[in-house]
Amino acid sequence: MAAEAEEAARHNNIKALYDNIRVLTNKFKKSSRPVKDKLGNTLKTAEEQMKRWVEHFKEVLNQPPPPHDANIQPAAAELPINCNRPSKAEISKAINTLKNNKSPGPDNIPAEVLKADLETSTQMLYELLGKIWEDENIPQDWKEGHLVKLPKKGDLSICDNYRGIMLLSVPGKVLNRVMLERMKKTVDQKLRDNQAGFRQNRSCADQIATLRIIIEQSLEFTSPLYTVFIDFQKAFDSLDRSVLWKLMAHYGIPKKIITIIKNIYT
């Protein structure tokens, strides 16, 4: 295995080198925990546990659509967002913004590999992303990922007490970042002022500060105040994606970009 890693390095085969190093260092060690089925029975074999995890995430990630179709109308005109193929400058910037020391997707290509030779990586992705942009066809490898479960609170033998994250292809994230940068500034101007989450230079801390001011004023003027806190169960996992495409059209996102994003998830 060490000889294979050395040979891969000699031939500049970064992917093979990374694969061999990962095996040699035994970086990922599987830990076994008891897993219970829906009835609370402990599953003993690895096969039974795997089937239970598959069952759990299928249910979480494939929620039935809402009973009534959302009546969301598209904008009268599209926003002035660049719909040309990604430029080399955009791709290079997107690569540089990728975070290091993050687990890669199934292709085992981490961000560090793309950054090691930025010029070559940019040129290769320029050709690839250009074809993807023209054909609106996303590589199947970019649609697949490693599903990793992260423990939350409570009994860790119960599947509901885990949060799943998907490790996707890093080169695929370059395309996502290019589209995000194109949309971000223009779309931000269309969002409601009271939305703080998922916005640049704003966070939920802004909402907490606002709520505190409202409470203090209510106490000062002895006026009644009613607050409602809603915690949606598995909010992001249970979204109906067909509604997302309608919302994007409602905000004026160009059809070209919606189609490409939609094809990532189908």
Regions found by a protein language model. Name each.
Residues 65-91, 137, 142-146, 185-238, ...:
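Active-site-proximal segment of RNA-dependent polymerases
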Residues 4:
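Conserved nucleotidyltransferase catalytic core and NTase-mimicking acidic/glycine-rich helix/loop elements
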Residues 11-161, 166, 173-174, 191:
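Surface-exposed loop/turn segments and immediately adjacent short secondary-structure elements
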Residues 34, 91, 98, 102-109, ...:
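Conserved catalytic palm subdomain of right-hand nucleotidyl-transferase polymerases, strongest
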Residues 54, 122-126, 168, 172, ...:
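Hydrophobic face of alpha-helices
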Residues 252-253:
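Helix N-cap/coil-helix junction residues
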